[in-house]
């Protein structure tokens, strides 16, 4: 390889080591101050230090920023970020692209860097999933049935029966109980959902969701603004939003909701005084909203087919399971019908 070509390759390696290190630092800062998983923060720090060890004086000496034609190039999207989670995801993409460039060009002059970049790239894929809740969001997208609890003396037992037959998602909804009592229930539900491999969400209370180690929180229209909740919870955990009209659904997506509650479809004592939105809103969300949506409100065996016919792939229920004579069998029936498609 000619000397001029080698200098170009060294400049490419220098630029992309800078790019990767800067991207890692952006992610690391959010994990540090935004409450991300401790293991992800440690992984970021280790990766940044490893990148630094390969950023030698030889590579730095090849730098020629004044004559780099790429420094003045900009794209309109580069000046726009919708949320901290968006910042984190953009920078993960930047890291992955830089590592791929390092992997390819380092083969020409520094094979050990090429091998390391390949290993790092696959580690970053896993790190992104862990740090941004990709694993949680994948499981959320696969969920078809969502149990929202109501106060009951045998609440834990009912939920366990439902989990035993495959219920993938549970929300603790306790509107009246004192915070300490709710936390006690939440800790017990967190334990049983972990044992059964199910997602666990807490209604309304970001503080209690964090205190019990839940997978996320569900917010109503009058609860803490979603952006504030995200700032407290970090990018990994799930945030759901109740919606009752197309404008609310669009706003929830714009605010970064991971999933939507779509309802109430039918009249329900859980939402006393609220006019049902009907099946048309279910149809609208299925056709127009690019987020998982759970139809909710008065759904039971008698009307499930109509809800599915309106386009619902996912439903949330309260009384249909909480008040069932056999919660396990009822849950199994819903799962079988929903998974049939």
Curated annotation (Swiss-Prot):
Binds 1 Mg(2+) ion per subunit. The keyword Ribonucleoprotein does not apply. One of its GO terms (cellular component) is cytoplasm. Residues 61-80 are annotated as: Disordered. Residues 1-123 are annotated as: Unknown. Pathway: Cofactor biosynthesis; thiamine diphosphate biosynthesis; thiamine phosphate from 4-amino-2-methyl-5-diphosphomethylpyrimidine and 4-methyl-5-(2-phosphoethyl)-thiazole: step 1/1. It holds the Pfam family ThiD2. Residues 124-341 are annotated as: Thiamine-phosphate synthase. It comes from the Bacteria. Its cofactor is Mg(2+). InterPro entries: Aldolase_TIM (IPR013785), ThiamineP_synth_sf (IPR036206), ThiamineP_synth_TenI (IPR022998), ThiD2 (IPR041397), TMP_synthase (IPR034291), TMP_synthase_cyanobac_bac (IPR016229). It catalyses: 2-[(2R,5Z)-2-carboxy-4-methylthiazol-5(2H)-ylidene]ethyl phosphate + 4-amino-2-methyl-5-(diphosphooxymethyl)pyrimidine + 2 H(+) = thiamine phosphate + CO2 + diphosphate; 2-(2-carboxy-4-methylthiazol-5-yl)ethyl phosphate + 4-amino-2-methyl-5-(diphosphooxymethyl)pyrimidine + 2 H(+) = thiamine phosphate + CO2 + diphosphate; 4-methyl-5-(2-phosphooxyethyl)-thiazole + 4-amino-2-methyl-5-(diphosphooxymethyl)pyrimidine + H(+) = thiamine phosphate + diphosphate. 4-amino-2-methyl-5-(diphosphooxymethyl)pyrimidine binds at residues 171-175, 203, 242, 271. Gene3D superfamilies: Aldolase class I (3.20.20.70). Its EC number is 2.5.1.3. 2-[(2R,5Z)-2-carboxy-4-methylthiazol-5(2H)-ylidene]ethyl phosphate binds at residues 268-270, 298. The keyword Ribosomal protein does not apply. Keywords: Magnesium, Metal-binding, Thiamine biosynthesis, Transferase. GO terms for biological process: thiamine biosynthetic process; thiamine diphosphate biosynthetic process. Transmembrane segments: none annotated. Mg(2+) binds at residues 204, 223. Condenses 4-methyl-5-(beta-hydroxyethyl)thiazole monophosphate (THZ-P) and 2-methyl-4-amino-5-hydroxymethyl pyrimidine pyrophosphate (HMP-PP) to form thiamine monophosphate (TMP). Belongs to the thiamine-phosphate synthase family. HAMAP family: TMP_synthase (MF_00097), TMP_synthase_cyanobact (MF_01327). This is Thiamine-phosphate synthase. It comes from Gloeobacter violaceus (strain ATCC 29082 / PCC 7421).
């Amino acid at each position: 390889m000619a000397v001029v070509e080698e200098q170009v390759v060294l400049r490419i390696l220098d630029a992309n080591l800078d790019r990767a290190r800067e991207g890692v630092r952006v992610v690391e800062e959010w994990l540090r101050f935004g409450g991300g998983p401790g293991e992800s923060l440690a992984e970021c720090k280790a990766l940044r230090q490893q990148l630094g060890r390969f950023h030698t004086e030889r590579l730095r000496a090849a730098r020629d920023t004044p004559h780099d034609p790429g420094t003045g190039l900009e794209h309109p999207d580069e000046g726009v970020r919708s949320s901290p989670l968006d910042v984190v995801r953009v920078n993960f993409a930047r890291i992955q692209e830089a590592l791929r460039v390092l992997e390819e060009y380092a083969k020409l002059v520094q094979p050990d860097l090429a091998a390391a970049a390949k290993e790092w790239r696959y580690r970053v894929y896993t790190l992104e999933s862990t740090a941004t809740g990709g694993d949680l969001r994948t499981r959320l997208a696969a969920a078809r049935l969502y149990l929202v609890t109501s106060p009951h003396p045998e609440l834990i037992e009912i939920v366990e029966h439902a989990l035993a037959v495959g219920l993938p998602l549970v929300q603790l909804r306790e509107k009246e109980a004192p915070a300490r009592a709710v936390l006690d229930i939440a800790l017990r539900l967190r334990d049983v959902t972990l044992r059964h491999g199910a997602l666990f969400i807490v209604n309304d209370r970001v503080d209690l969701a964090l205190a019990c180690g839940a997978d996320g929180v569900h917010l109503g229209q009058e609860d803490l603004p979603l952006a504030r909740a995200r700032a407290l919870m970090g990018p990994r955990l799930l945030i759901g939003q109740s919606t009752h009209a197309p404008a609310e659904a669009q706003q929830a997506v714009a605010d970064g909701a991971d999933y939507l509650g779509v309802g109430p479809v039918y009249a329900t004592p859980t939402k006393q005084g609220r006019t049902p939105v009907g099946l048309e809103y279910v149809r609208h969300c299925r056709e127009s909203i690019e987020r998982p949506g759970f139809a909710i409100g008065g759904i039971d065996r008698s009307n499930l087919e109509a809800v599915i016919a309106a386009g619902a792939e996912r439903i949330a229920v309260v009384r249909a399971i909480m008040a069932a004579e056999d919660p396990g069998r009822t849950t199994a029936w819903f799962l079988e019908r929903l998974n049939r498609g």
